Amino acid sequence: SEMCIRDRLYFEMMSCLTTTGATVFTGLDKLPVSLNGWRCFLSWIGGMGLIVLSVAILPLLGVGGSQIIKAETTGPLKEHRLTPRIADTAKALYIIYLGVSVACAISYHLAGMEWEDAIMHMMTTVSLSGIGTHDASFAYFNSPAVDAVAIVFMLISGFNFSLHFMVWRRRNFLIYLQDAEAKAWIATAALMSACLLYTSPSPRDRQKS
């Protein structure tokens, strides 16, 4: 029914904007590029949507952007401003976000993706939404290089982007090891990777099966 279609579209839109990653669409390979691209773009916007909301909308309602940022964020941005003005902070974070995005898209292309897929998967990788454009997801490409790019940039995007800004400004990578959130993220990623490697069958076992 028409209402059912509206519900599905609303669910898909909110899933992308909140980077939830859930989808109600099937037959992703048959969807037009424009629709898949829009899904990925919404995810990419959602990846840094809090800053847009704080800087562009809330001040018009009489709510300071700095108030919601302090209430809703974690990491260095919660304790002190990265720049004197919130608008400048938003600009700095978006420059870093855009830089990571461009590097991710180029890396995907060098790993074997067409530019079309590289750009769309870049948007869902750096936003950590996981929205796919193929029913088989990354298995569609059957490429260890593509998988490696996804892993690296998901690890990078898992860090607080305000922390990336501080590392870039101070030129000191040890800042990552001084932040509790970053250390927890590194430890969790390392632990999960070790568990997956331990439980995954070896190439010899796969050949036997």
Model-derived features: positions:
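Membrane-proximal intracellular helices of multi-pass ion channels
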Residues: S1-E2, R6-R206
